Amino acid sequence: MGILSGNPQDEPMHYGEVFGLWSYVMAGNKMVGNYQMLLNHVGDDDLKKLLRESIEKCQDEIKQVSTILKENGVALPPASPEPPTADLNDIPPGARFLDPDVAASAAAENAAGLVTCSKMMGQSIREDIAMMFGQFHMSKAATGAKYLRLLKNKGWLIPPPLHLQKHHEA
């Protein structure tokens, strides 16, 4: 029997895991608040639906990670209060975020979450934590595909310079 080869949930977390989990909850709380605030600015129904789905997934992830932190005696980071809802028409035109910008921002935040999940998978020595972040990663990849499809279908995607020349072998 090797070191830390028992039930992963009975194993201690190392400092990197503790900080990574704690930071994930803190960033997740902030992301939920950001998405809730951005919902006030969105007029497109498809984007609203995807933002609400993103909020629900993030809240579920926060709950799972918070459970592990609590079980290991780690205090949770503070969460911001839920932002108030506002009517889209009450937001002055110059102060309103546009739907294409909201979609691009949400897609970028989701992509950053993929990187964070990969980092946590790589640094975890507890299999349960690595597997949990593997599941989060798969979910974020699927959500990222939905954002990409939405951006393309709505004509909101701003592509980088496209390489149109074919490579010819000599």
UniProtKB/Swiss-Prot annotation:
UniProt xrefs under Pfam families: DUF3231 (PF11553)
InterPro entries: DUF3231 (IPR021617), Ferritin-like (IPR012347)
Domain of life (superkingdom): Bacteria
Gene3D superfamilies attached to this UniProt entry: 1.20.1260.10
Protein name: Uncharacterized protein YvdQ
